[in-house]
Amino acid sequence: MAKKRRRFTLKKVPLAAWLVIAFFAVGSMLVVSSYWSQRQSEVSQRQAIVDKKAAEKAKKKAFIKRLVPTAQTMQQQYGVLTSITLAQAILESDWGTSTLAKDYHNLFGIKGTDPATTKVLRTKEYVNDKWITVDGRFRVYSDDAASIRDHALLFVNGTDWNPQQYATVRAAKDYKTAASALQTDGYATDPDYPQKLIHLIEAWNLTQYDN
């Protein structure tokens, strides 16, 4: 008599078990999706930062390039190093973004006395070993080139009380000597002024424009 074959049947999985499995499956998918979404967000943020820095650097290079021709002409005519002119313009105008530079083309913070050709603005001065805010009367120019020319002529003609005040700046043959002379000759009150100029000149290789 032939034996009956035993049938193998799958045991029914309780509904609760299926729900648990589905819960963990969906949860895993959500975790993975969230991870990749976060990664994409981080990548996008990093790229945005890189793009912003690149745009800022491009603007700064464009600012330098725009001033170079006039600055080099002033060096040829009056002996003021182009690298010094560029570094001062960058530092004094914050890359051409200051109100004085944007609205009045005064790149160097040069002051004046004639109300018809000047504008009163708030400025910071280093007095008695501390920074203070004061009102200053600054010259207004028609364009940046006019500001650069006036800057060079200031070194040539000096001040009303001392025509030779900036003679050592013009006589300097290298940017470090010229930067130090600006401090000793009284151009700026900031005790760190020379070092700030030197840093800008070296960081942006501004000596390449000296002729």
Short names for language-model regions:
Residues 1-91, 95-211:
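Catalytic cores of secreted/periplasmic lytic hydrolases that degrade extracellular macromolecules
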